[in-house]
């Protein structure tokens, strides 16, 4: 679709209307999934989807220092989805009569609208590929940029950034496009500079300040990121750092009696209880990721 990137979820059974907010972790995990399926099938549709998703993140959710922001809001001018919807008149005005009609027929754009009186461009009723309309998509993307900008949640979370670093490293190995590896390495340097003190990690960065605490997920995903960078570069520094942070995670979070890892270390007095999370929800649990890290190490 126009501008690329995945929204959080669909609000209807037909997958027409998304909740328009876009989260870093969703896009990172989906890049991993698409690259993995491409590796198994060699179907370039999957690699193309992964690359377009990465392009969205690098263009819309990346700080000047190389870290990745947390989310892009759903609302524009107080209306959810307004930034992403079009009228038929807009499409014709922007693309011209002939191109506008072709695009509208393919992408379900009507005078009546397919969503609350306006249109969400979609291919649910069409057999064409969006690549057939790359020129029109770019034109509409640049037209859309003149609208009120979407709010960015500009927190930089180490765990979500680590997911994105791992995804970009995988994407580099699938595509051999150096820009993805460069972005992954830049982000890791940002995290190392701003969210690491020795083997102590900090959860978040905002307004030139880091948080005070860290959790199992921060270590687990950061170790994964370092391992993926090692596999992409064969630079042993990444492997050695992964091993060091793995030992530190064991020291801080391990349940030495019953196995597994607690969410927080014993020095964190802000939590009245210290759960041991094993459920994989919107993101894999820290325990799952640590098990994966141990196997790879």
Provide a role label for each language-model segment:
Residues 1-297:
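Glycan-recognition and catalytic cores of secretory/periplasmic carbohydrate-active enzymes
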